[in-house]
Amino acid sequence: MLKEFREFVLRGNVADMAVGIIIGGAFGAIVNTLVSDVLMPPLGLLIGGIDFSNFYLVLKEGSAPGPYAALADAKAVGAVTVNYGIFLNALISFMIMAFAVFMLIKSLTSMRGKPEPPAPAPAVKECPYCCSTIPLKASRCPECTSQLEK
């Protein structure tokens, strides 16, 4: 059983998939940091000093009544919130990651090139008696007049 597991793991597809998952996770972390730490702060500054991660909607106030200055304050007093700013950050991260994967797949596809079309089926055959070329559907050779098998 250990030998079978070793063969399974050492197969090319499994190792490639493992590397892809590890690199994908690291790439996801980079994109998340890009969105939350690089893209969103300047965008919030342009809009008026807004931190998108602090966009939330209070469904139920916590032990201290609102309004709360930040999402962390609302969570600290146990308020129930819908955190749509964090969702917005995640949505932008997803869009960037999806676009990057699309561009990667598109470039890989263009490097491979188009597959060659299969060769067309022959429209002619050779007469077994006189070796002349005859149509594929012929039942009699026009050169030697031999009866052909179908």
UniProtKB/Swiss-Prot annotation:
Where is it mostly found? Answer: membrane
Q: Does the keyword tRNA processing apply?
A: no
The residue ranges crossing the membrane are 19-39, 85-105
Its GO CC terms are:
plasma membrane
Q: Which SUPFAM superfamilies match?
A: Gated mechanosensitive channel (SSF81330)
Keyword list, A-Z = Cell inner membrane, Cell membrane, Ion channel, Ion transport, Membrane, Transmembrane, Transmembrane helix, Transport
- Gene Ontology molecular function terms on file: mechanosensitive monoatomic ion channel activity
Q: Which residues form a coiled coil?
A: none
What subcellular locations does the record give? Cell inner membrane
Record InterPro entries: MS_channel (IPR001185), MSC/AndL (IPR037673), MscL_channel (IPR036019)
Can the keyword Transmembrane helix be found in this entry's annotation? yes
Instruction: Tell me where the signal peptide lies.
Output: none
Q: Membrane topology type, per the record? A: Multi-pass membrane protein
Q: Which family does it belong to?
A: Belongs to the MscL family.
Entries under NCBIfam families matching the protein? mscL
Tell me, what does this protein do in biology?
Channel that opens in response to stretch forces in the membrane lipid bilayer. May participate in the regulation of osmotic pressure changes within the cell.
Quaternary organization: Homopentamer.
The protein in question is named: Large-conductance mechanosensitive channel
Source species = Chlorobium limicola (strain DSM 245 / NBRC 103803 / 6330)
